[in-house]
């Protein structure tokens, strides 16, 4: 009778009921509630031939790249194209290091698309060339609010989770994690599962809040509500890539890692903890009654932002000086450059 009154418009459902209905309807959304992306890729190549890596592995043109006589991670120089970075030095043990952060991954996907290649093709080329996986991050985007980060944090506090590591950290504000994240001022409530010093840990945060702070996108209009990042280093990164290239099944690779390290349960006082029922929301997230998850791409074009910053920093001061010399001495250095 209560539902009939709501359906006929004689009664308005409560705010709490509307939230429940929206969440349940999201289960039947024809669009996949979850998508997955590469969000960080760092590979070291045991060679000093940076031109070979850029031309034959990345399949990019080194002539279009910016070159700088400094680097990070104790490398002495680097080449960049937008947010794609390749570091090198004279130290043979260091070799050549490729680093793609979030935007770098999106920009590189544009080049992969133009090359009629995909991530699997690139990773296979990298491994065949002796590439050493230093870090791989897989980001699972939650588009419908499957995950409830405060609820997961509370379950961690109450020890209602089973995993290899009991270590967790929950932050209400991104300001508290400024020494760990590049986008720390944008991240909303954030939960880390596992030791941050280990080769495997997870980071779950409110992506809709990040987009609100960064772009002003209203929370209710955000395409991605939460993001679950699987962060892998060294050997663990290698085994994940090997698994991807063996089975070509991103969902299997991602959730086999998650299930191996953590699962959230609901307390049942009369049972052993290992026999507690899997939490319904968590069960849905890891694959119970939802559409399958596939590796997706979200290519973004290269922008001139970084190039313009480089021109302002490296070139503009010299041009300004030449203009003054031309004006004072009657020379035509600027005209020669423009030709």
Where are these regions (language model features)?
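Residues within the helices of the helix-turn-helix
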Residues: 1, 19, 302
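Structured, helix-rich domain cores that form ligand/interaction pockets
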Residues: 27-302, 307-339
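Recognition helix of helix-turn-helix/homeodomain-like DNA-binding domains
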Residues: 1-13
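DNA major-groove recognition helix of helix-turn-helix/homeodomain DNA-binding modules
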Residues: 14-29
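Generic alpha-helical scaffold signal
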Residues: 12-15, 92-94
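DNA major-groove recognition helices of helix-turn-helix
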Residues: 10, 21, 311-314
């Amino acid at each position: 009778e209560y539902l009939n009154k709501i359906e006929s418009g004689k009664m308005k459902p409560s705010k709490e009921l509307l939230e429940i209905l929206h969440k349940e309807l999201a289960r039947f959304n024809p669009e996949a509630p979850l998508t997955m992306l590469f969000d960080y890729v760092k590979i070291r190549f045991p060679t000093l031939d940076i031109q070979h890596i850029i031309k034959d592995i990345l399949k990019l043109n080194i002539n279009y790249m910016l070159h700088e006589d400094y680097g990070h991670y104790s490398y002495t120089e680097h080449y960049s194209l937008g947010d794609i970075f390749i570091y090198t030095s004279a130290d043979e043990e260091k070799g050549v290091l490729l680093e793609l952060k979030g935007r770098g991954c999106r920009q590189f996907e544009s080049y992969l698309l133009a090359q009629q290649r995909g991530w699997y093709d690139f990773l296979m080329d990298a491994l065949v060339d002796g590439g050493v996986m230093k870090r791989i991050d897989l980001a699972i985007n939650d588009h419908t609010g499957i995950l409830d980060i405060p609820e997961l944090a509370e379950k961690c506090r109450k020890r209602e989770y089973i995993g290899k590591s009991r270590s967790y950290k929950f932050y209400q504000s991104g300001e508290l994690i400024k020494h760990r994240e590049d986008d720390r001022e944008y991240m909303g409530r954030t939960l880390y599962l596992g030791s941050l010093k280990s080769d495997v840990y997870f980071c779950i945060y409110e992506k809709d809040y990040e987009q609100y702070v960064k772009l002003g996108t209203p929370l209710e209009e955000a395409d991605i509500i939460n993001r679950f990042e699987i962060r892998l280093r060294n050997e663990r990164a290698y085994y994940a890539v090997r698994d991807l290239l063996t089975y070509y099944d991103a969902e299997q690779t991602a959730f086999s890692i998650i299930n191996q390290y953590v699962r959230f349960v609901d307390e049942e006082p009369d049972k052993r903890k290992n026999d507690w029922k899997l939490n319904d929301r968590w069960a849905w997230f890891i694959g119970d009654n939802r559409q399958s998850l596939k590796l997706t791409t979200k290519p973004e074009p290269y922008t001139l932002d970084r190039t313009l910053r480089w021109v302002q920093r490296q070139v503009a001061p010299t041009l300004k000086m030449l203009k003054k010399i031309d004006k004072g001495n009657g020379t035509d250095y600027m005209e020669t450059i423009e030709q």
